[in-house]
Design a protein with these regions (language model features):
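Polybasic, lysine-enriched low-complexity intrinsically disordered terminal tails
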Residues: 1-34
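Beta-rich carbohydrate-recognition and catalytic domains
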Residues: 27-68, 72-141, 150-204, 208-258, ...
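Short, exposed beta-strand/loop patches in secreted or surface proteins that constitute
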Residues: 148, 266, 333
Length: 377
């Protein structure tokens, strides 16, 4: 019995030696979980386990709300900066990281960014009227709605700064990528790039220079508004971008009759720059929706194509139960392994994520096909 058995084993081994080896494909650190992949690749889809970040009631600085996230991809992970509000009603930024784009692996125990002198101007409160502003509930001011852009080895952040009384301005800061991913929050001193005495929100920095200059997209209504500078150091506290306030007028007979502003930083494609934007419909008021447009690569003031339908609408419970109902507000988006991950705030209270096959989204926008977000049941 033993001899035939050895002969059989030897034969098998010989066969294995002569078989052709197929090299294994390296696994990506980011993978789409089967339970969230749509059978129809042209449809954006929410993560079924949304929200991915919720208020931490044991943490004084993020106990009330965690929302409006921005994101960058680096070191095989998605790095998220989100707005947080706690017991003092002061808005700060928190940090979280995800290896698969969905599950939060780590969440910072301390704020990643606090504008130390957010009361940045002496205010004559007796003679200066207080504006009626309560974006997300940060009654006592702070930092709001961050937008991250990674250029070379440096992370740039634009955000809205509110002094708690009458000034809502755009500020710019930056940090080395190495410090950022290691949670060493050595941010550069912030500098205001919007003028005093004006209200501005939703400004973003392009991820690369255009025609040799840095480009800041600071408005989409009444037209595309972009500021070009040779060096970001030109913003020294005396130079400001003069932006025309949104007119609110969108495309006639369309869902985006009231344009609000840009979402995440633009993403480069072969067709142009992908820009996600927030808008409302006069026929469906009080509901923030997300649309998409393509801007020309060399002249991004020119709109190449625009989605006929919103790619995201506030239809889920977590987008309607919170500080402000009917809100989906995206400040971050990354492309990984051919998938677009969109990070957004729901109801000004929680952080959520939705995905779509990147090429399918772009082709649908260019061909003007309706794009609709669905939730997998």
């Amino acid at each position: 019995m033993a001899a035939p058995k050895k002969k059989k084993v030897k034969k098998v081994l010989k066969k294995k030696r002569t078989s052709k080896k197929v090299p294994k494909k390296p696994r990506s650190k980011i993978s789409i979980k089967k339970r969230v992949v749509s059978k129809k690749p042209h449809q954006l889809q929410r993560f079924v386990a949304n929200p991915i970040i919720s208020p931490a009631h044991h943490s004084h600085w993020q106990s009330k709300a965690t929302f409006n996230p921005t994101a960058i991809f680096g070191d095989g992970q998605v790095h998220i900066i989100y707005r947080a509000i706690g017991a003092g009603d002061v808005s700060v930024f928190g940090y979280a990281v995800s290896k698969d784009g969905f599950t939060i692996e780590k969440r910072g125990t301390k704020p990643a960014y606090i504008q130390r002198n957010y009361h940045f101007e002496r205010i004559d409160k007796e003679n200066t009227p207080k504006i009626n502003y309560s974006s997300g509930g940060g009654w006592n001011g702070g930092v709001e709605d961050p937008r991250l852009t990674l250029i070379d080895d440096r992370v740039y952040m634009l955000y809205t700064s509110f002094n708690g009384w009458n000034a809502i301005r755009i500020a710019l800061t930056s940090i080395s990528f190495k410090d950022f991913v290691n949670e060493r929050w050595n941010w550069s001193p912030h500098v205001f790039i919007s003028p005093p005495g004006e209200i501005h929100k939703n400004w973003v920095l392009f991820p690369e220079k255009i025609n040799g200059k840095y480009a800041i997209l600071h408005g989409i209504s009444p037209h595309i508004q972009i500021e070009y500078v040779k060096d970001l150091k030109e913003f020294d506290g005396t130079k400001f971008i003069h932006s025309i306030p949104p007119s609110g007028k969108g495309h006639s007979k369309s869902w985006d009759t009231w344009l609000r502003g840009v979402g995440p930083a633009p993403i480069k494609t072969k067709y142009g720059w992908l820009v996600l934007y927030h808008a409302m419909d006069i026929k469906d008021p009080n509901r923030y929706k997300l649309g998409a447009m393509i801007l020309d690569l060399n002249n991004p003031k020119k709109v190449v194509a625009i989605s006929k339908q919103p790619i995201l609408e506030p239809d889920e419970v977590y987008e309607n139960e919170g500080f402000k109902a009917g809100v989906v507000y995206a400040c971050g988006a990354v492309v990984v392994d051919g998938w677009l991950f969109v990070y957004y705030g729901g109801a000004d209270t929680v952080v959520c994520v939705a995905t779509i096959k990147f090429d399918s989204l772009i082709k649908d926008i260019v061909s003007n096909k309706p794009i609709k977000l669905r939730t997998k049941k």
